[in-house]
């Protein structure tokens, strides 16, 4: 017998024996009612009846309240319990939820338990069938009276009493509380089937704290009978029998017997095995076939169990094969129960069937042999029909009726229950064909079959489950997981597929041939077919499958090349139009732009815009582009390519004769949606990455091409620009594999943009492991083998998308964090090293969104990016210059690796003689950085005007060719945004704040530089003095008495000047506007959540939303969508400026508050651009809050200087002194009203940033 653990105690059942998870809590269930094959439950609360239930996910035995003994004997860290939890965001009433005990603070027990339990609440409530549950990171403190102990059925069943179960057992694991793990499921199966056959109603309830299967009659409903009927199942001489017991619930006449039944050891061994490898006692009609050869997929060290059923009946086998929906969760009683009475060779009472039981220990020692053999002696037990001797005559359940005919409705009801039992009781086993198993997985061993023995020596093989195909179909009984060796072979197979794809697709692209094929798709297809036929002639041994695969690849390529937006003309007409005629186009309102000489259609009518829409007004910050400045030619008279803009003035939407010979003809639909600065940047990208916008003049091997930078203001449409460029670039260079790297917050935006613009290019998004486990996207499907774990699934998903990325022209998108994880060189896993190798060598084009982030010289991410083997790069940034010229140099080198060479050629006079020397790349980069800082940076930083101008000119001459800069009005569209007003509020501190800030400032004056701990404390104290208590370093600078006084100020909003301003502003505008609050730290966000809840009675998740770095990708997307929802209930969004200041759109907000200042001005600029961007319908007001006389003033002056340097680098005109950017005036009516009503003089100075602000 299995030894009991000390924590497994037996307990009587609760008067309400079950509990179900509904409406966010576990509710007590009085009884389960089974009628006509359906199961319903009656709740204790309000007597409500539930009929649409998931019994194996949300139903279990009711948990019992914890006692004083449980604290000492059972409760410990690591076990699962049910706790009473206060969930503020959903309901004010506490609810019962599942949790895990993390730690226990033990205290001496007196009259009651005073111990404190730290528990972590599960996120996935009501899903007890999950193997792994997600837990909330924030622990919850509960007491013993708020804990309930989980319960499960005990292993001992009553066989001769009116009750079936007497006790329940304590359970320490949430997964083990499932009702389908023990012997309760076979009983439930019998009750459901019997209720359909004979219209009997059962109730599973508690009587005298014992579980009873009560049979409900009319007398019970009327209350005229004092006795009740209950059903129980017993075993007599190896025969399973069901019987009815009459009992009086008013008298407890049934006493427990001290004598326990003795059960044969072999049967117990079989019954104790897990349900996935064994069957219940009364369904054990089987025998074990010896193991045989195993392939690499077998689950070491386990073997497949193969059940053999001996039968004397041919028609019985046919009956079983006709039913198509049998599942392993329902066993032999159903087959006995549903036998057809009128069959020619019906079931005979005199004939007996056999259960062949094999000793478990001997089964492991069996050798692999062909055929059927036994290595141990078998014990044979007589087994008669299960339901023949059931003594239920008063209910009409005799043997003849049970073996009677079965109607179609009955089979439908049984099939309905069988599907539910298979779904929730056990993972449904998938069926595969033998050919798929052998070809895909290399399976060599036989598949588990069921051998039905006849009286003769021959045997017949068929499957236990009734298949939809051939009746001889075999079935494999699989384990839950694969072995480590199987995982490795499965991953190796994916990596070999990538290698074969790279070898097949890694060929150089002929630009001229590709362009001619795009211009004349028909001839291109003919040439491709000719090349295909030549290859087939050369290789006489090419299989038919390879030919079909090649034809499919050609069709896929043709479908991609033959875009619906392109004009399709035959070869003869094309040559006639291009060679024999000098076209003179005129507009035909039915056809389009037609040549009046030859009739050639230059532009279809669907691509011609209306006359009133051809000329759109374009607004920029500094000047208008004159028509005379735009050149309509591509090549000058000398045959040298012109570097001027090539968009025609007459109509930007209509391709001219010259445009049909350049890349604009590749994206006619997208071109109409691009704005002027995007069109200039589009040609800029082609010239830097391909050498020209004319395919005939492109030279991919030229030394002049290289990486480039697109530095457009935030919100100017950089993402759409790159998407349009990639759509055209992959048509000319299908073998270039673009890799897009972006911050985690912008991955969702990239994916939506591809869908929004209907780009005909496949996009493969590589998730991080944690994001993949939480996402609903499961692209990998496995047939015939157990489903791998989440980690292996994530690896296979990455490898599968990388293989598709190589197989056809497509885009691979992933986050910087995932890229850095895969690029680790010290990984011990072979697949990690392989993926790192592929990501280094395969990309033909590297796109770095927000590429200014990896700018540090020591950054591991930057070092990994520099190792990517391609010079073709696009770096996107709205704020290119960050902190200093060293980081600026690193950013330019990241975008254009050739920049190192260009700097040395320009600045190092000795480099010309030493360039033949082969030096390491990092040494050359260090040398170039030194010259860049010593010559250019020093000249720009000097106060001498002429020397500064010289340095700026040198920098522009070196970088203007590969940097495209656009400083518009904050909008990337042709629509003019309503306006932007930026105010800097220099605020006075309250008395308590002033005392703390003065002390911290005095301590900082004794240090050289800015210690991080002091900087953090000053930043927090400037918002509210209580926030210093949230840090771990506060005890270093404040004594316990001071901290005690500070603790009392938590909920006093008047003690913080910034807090008072935020509450006043929100109070005045909340009814008509939404507010976006940015903060560098998390502690102020939590404080403001509590203040908003107390002052405005708002709730988190409804009016209050938070966007921080700990949220996963999809959760961030849901928060953004909820805040952007028109007419939604959200009012305030508190966001972390570090995690959420880039790449997202929050145009629902028209008021932006910056609680603290940043060292990097680009962060503030990016944060403002979340609200002030295309789609904004209101004037945006920005409030930068600074505390007077503190470190925040120094940070603000430093960031202003950085903005000025950045303006000088990219502006060709004179940039005025930063002191002239500010003006002491207020044009905001709300702000003016707050200042007028300010009685405590919170504001020292209010300045408006005239340079950054726009009209509004």
Swiss-Prot record:
Q: Where are the transmembrane segments?
A: none
Question: From the record, which residues define motif DEAH box?
Answer: 849-852
* Organism of origin: Arabidopsis thaliana (Mouse-ear cress)
Record-annotated Helicase C-terminal domain positions: 1061-1222
According to the UniProt entry, which residue ranges have a biased composition of type Basic and acidic residues?
278-290
- Superkingdom, according to UniProt? Eukaryota
Q: Which Pfam family, just one, is annotated for this protein?
A: SNF2-rel_dom
Instruction: Using the UniProt annotation, give all residue ranges assigned to the region (Disordered).
Output: 269-290, 448-467
Q: What else is known?
A: Associates in vivo with Pol IV but not with Pol V.
Keywords from UniProt, A to Z, are: ATP-binding, Helicase, Hydrolase, Nucleotide-binding, Nucleus
Report the subcellular localization.
Nucleus, Nucleoplasm; Nucleus, Nucleolus
**From start to end residue, where is composition biased (Basic residues)?**
451-463
What are the residue boundaries of the Helicase ATP-binding domain, all occurrences included? 699-898
This molecule's function is given as: Probable chromatin remodeling factor. Required for the initial establishment of DNA methylation and for accumulation of 24-nt siRNAs. May act on RNA templates by remodeling ribonucleoprotein structures and thereby influencing the availability of the RNA to polymerases.
Q: What is this protein called in UniProt?
A: SNF2 domain-containing protein CLASSY 1
Self-association state and partner proteins as the record states: Interacts with NRPD1, NRPD3 and SHH1.
Q: What is the effect of changing residue 738 to L?
A: Decreased de novo methylation
Q: Disrupted gene: resulting phenotype?
A: Decreased, but not completely blocked de novo methylation. Probably due to a partial redundancy with CLSY2.
MF (Gene Ontology): ATP binding; chromatin binding; helicase activity; hydrolase activity
């Amino acid at each position: 017998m299995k030894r009991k653990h000390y924590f497994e105690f037996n307990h009587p059942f609760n008067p309400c024996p079950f509990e179900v998870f509904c409406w966010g809590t576990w509710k007590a269930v009085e009884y389960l009612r089974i009628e006509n094959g359906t199961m319903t439950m009656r709740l204790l609360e309000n007597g409500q009846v539930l009929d649409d239930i998931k019994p194996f996910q949300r139903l279990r035995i009711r948990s019992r309240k914890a006692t004083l003994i449980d604290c000492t004997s059972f409760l410990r860290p690591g076990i699962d319990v049910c706790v009473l939890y206060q969930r503020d965001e959903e309901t004010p009433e506490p609810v019962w939820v599942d949790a895990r005990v993390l730690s226990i603070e033990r205290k001496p027990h007196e009259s009651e338990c005073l111990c404190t339990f730290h528990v972590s609440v599960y996120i996935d409530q009501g899903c007890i069938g999950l193997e792994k549950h997600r837990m909330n990171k924030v622990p919850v403190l509960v007491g013993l009276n708020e804990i309930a102990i989980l319960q499960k059925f005990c292993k001992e069943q009553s066989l001769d009493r009116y009750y079936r179960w007497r006790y329940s057992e304590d359970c320490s694991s949430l997964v083990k509380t499932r009702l389908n793990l023990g012997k309760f499921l076979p009983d439930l199966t019998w009750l459901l089937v019997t209720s359909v056959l004979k219209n009997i109603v059962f109730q599973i309830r508690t009587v005298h704290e014992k579980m009873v299967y009560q049979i409900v009659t009319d007398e019970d409903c009327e209350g005229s009978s004092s006795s009740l009927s209950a059903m129980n199942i017993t075993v007599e001489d190896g025969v399973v029998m069901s019987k009815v017991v009459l009992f009086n619930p008013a008298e407890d006449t049934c006493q427990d017997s001290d004598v326990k039944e003795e059960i044969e050891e072999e049967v117990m061994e079989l019954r104790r095995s897990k349900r996935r490898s064994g069957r219940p006692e009364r369904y054990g009609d089987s025998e074990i076939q010896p193991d045989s050869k195993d392939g690499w997929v077998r689950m070491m060290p386990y073997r497949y169990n193969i059940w053999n059923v001996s039968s004397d009946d041919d028609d019985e086998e046919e009956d079983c094969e006709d039913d198509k929906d049998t599942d392993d969760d329902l066993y032999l009683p159903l087959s006995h129960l549903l036998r057809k009475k009128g069959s020619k060779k019906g079931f005979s009472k005199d004939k007996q069937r056999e259960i062949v039981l094999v000793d478990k220990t001997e089964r492991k020692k069996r050798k692999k042999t062909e055929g059927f053999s036994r290595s141990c002696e078998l014990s044979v037990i007589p087994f008669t029909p299960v339901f023949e001797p059931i003594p239920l005559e008063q209910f009409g359940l005799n043997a003849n009726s049970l073996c009677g005919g079965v109607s179609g409705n009955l089979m439908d009801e049984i099939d309905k229950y069988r599907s539910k039992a298979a779904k929730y009781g056990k993972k449904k086993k998938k069926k595969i064909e033998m050919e798929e198993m052998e070809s895909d997985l290399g399976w060599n061993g036989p598949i588990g079959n069921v051998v039905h023995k006849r009286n003769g020596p021959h045997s017949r093989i068929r499957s236990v489950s009734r298949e939809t195909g051939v009746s001889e179909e075999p079935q494999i009984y699989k384990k839950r997981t694969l072995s480590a060796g199987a995982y490795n072979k499965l991953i190796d197979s994916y990596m070999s597929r990538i290698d074969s794809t790279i070898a097949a697709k890694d060929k150089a692209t002929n630009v001229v041939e590709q362009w001619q094929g795009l211009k004349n798709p028909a001839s291109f297809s003919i040439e491709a077919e000719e090349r295909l036929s030549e290859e087939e002639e050369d290789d006489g041994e090419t299989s038919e499958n390879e030919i079909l695969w090649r034809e499919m690849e050609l069709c896929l390529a043709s479908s991609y090349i033959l875009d619906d937006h392109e004009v399709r003309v035959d070869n003869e007409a094309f040559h006639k139009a291009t060679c024999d005629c000098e076209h003179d186009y005129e507009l035909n309102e039915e056809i389009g732009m037609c040549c009046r000489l030859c009739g050639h259609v230059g532009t279809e009518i669907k691509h011609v815009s209306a006359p009133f829409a051809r000329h759109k007004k374009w607004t920029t910050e500094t000047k208008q582009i004159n028509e005379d400045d735009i050149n309509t030619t591509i090549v000058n008279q000398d045959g040298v390519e012109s570097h001027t803009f090539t968009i025609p003035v007459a109509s930007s939407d209509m391709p001219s004769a010259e445009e049909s010979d350049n890349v604009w003809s590749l994206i006619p639909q997208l071109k109409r949606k691009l704005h002027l600065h995007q069109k200039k940047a589009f040609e800029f990208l082609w010239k830097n990455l391909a050498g020209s916008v004319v395919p005939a003049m492109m030279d991919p091997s030229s030394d002049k091409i290289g990486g480039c930078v697109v530095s457009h203001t935030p919100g100017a449409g950089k993402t759409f620009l790159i998407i349009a460029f990639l759509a055209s670039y992959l048509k000319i260079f299908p073998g270039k594999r673009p890799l897009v790297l972006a911050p985690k917050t912008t991955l969702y935006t990239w994916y939506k943009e591809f869908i929004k613009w209907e780009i005909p290019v496949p996009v493969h998004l590589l998730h991080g492991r944690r994001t993949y486990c939480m996402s609903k996207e499961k692209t990998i499907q496995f047939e015939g083998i157990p489903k791998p774990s989440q980690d292996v699934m994530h690896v296979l998903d990455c490898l599968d998308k990388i293989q598709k990325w190589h197989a056809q022209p497509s885009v691979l998108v992933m986050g910087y964090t995932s890229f850095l994880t895969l690029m680790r060189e010290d990984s011990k896993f072979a697949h990690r090293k392989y993926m790192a190798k592929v990501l280094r060598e395969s990309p033909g084009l590297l796109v770095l969104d927000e590429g200014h982030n990896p700018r540090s010289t020591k950054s591991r991410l930057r070092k990994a990016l520099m190792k990517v083997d391609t010079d073709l790069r696009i770096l996107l940034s709205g704020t290119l210059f960050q902190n200093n010229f060293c980081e600026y140099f690193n950013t330019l080198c990241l975008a254009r690796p050739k920049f190192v060479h260009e700097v040395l050629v320009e600045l190092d006079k000795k480099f010309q003689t030493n360039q033949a020397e082969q030096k390491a790349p990092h040494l050359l980069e260090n040398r170039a950085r030194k010259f860049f800082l010593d010559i250019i940076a020093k000249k720009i930083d000097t106060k001498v005007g002429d020397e500064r101008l010289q340095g700026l000119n040198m920098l522009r001459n070196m970088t203007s060719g590969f940097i495209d800069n656009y400083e518009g009005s904050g909008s990337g569209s042709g629509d003019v945004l309503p306006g932007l007003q930026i105010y800097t509020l220099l605020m006075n501190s309250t008395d308590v704040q002033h005392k703390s800030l003065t002390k911290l400032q005095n301590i900082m004056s004794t240090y050289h530089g800015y210690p991080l701990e002091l900087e953090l404390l000053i930043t927090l104290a400037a918002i509210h003095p209580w926030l210093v208590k949230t840090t771990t370093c506060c005890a270093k600078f404040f004594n316990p008495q001071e901290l005690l006084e500070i603790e009392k100020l938590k909920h006093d909003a008047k003690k913080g000047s910034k807090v008072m301003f935020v509450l006043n502003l929100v109070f005045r505008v909340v009814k008509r506007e939404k507010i976006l609050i940015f903060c560098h730290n998390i502690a102020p966000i939590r404080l403001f959540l509590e203040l908003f809840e107390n002052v405005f009675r708002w709730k988190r998740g409804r009016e209050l939303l938070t966007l921080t770095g700990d949220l996963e990708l999809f959760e961030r997307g849901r928060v953004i969508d909820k805040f952007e929802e028109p007419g939604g209930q959200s009012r305030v969004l508190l966001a972390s400026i570090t995690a959420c200041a880039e790449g997202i759109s929050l145009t629902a907000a028209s008021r932006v508050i910056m609680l603290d200042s940043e060292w990097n001005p680009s962060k503030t600029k990016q944060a403002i651009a979340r609200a002030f961007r295309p789609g904004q319908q209101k004037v945006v007001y920005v409030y930068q809050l600074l505390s007077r006389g503190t470190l925040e003033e120094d940070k603000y002056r430093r960031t202003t200087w950085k903005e000025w340097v950045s303006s000088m680098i990219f502006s060709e005109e004179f940039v005025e002194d930063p002191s002239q950017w500010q003006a002491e005036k207020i044009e905001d009516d709300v702000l003016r009203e707050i200042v007028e009503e300010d009685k405590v003089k919170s504001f020292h100075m209010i300045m408006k940033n005239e340079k950054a602000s726009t009209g509004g």
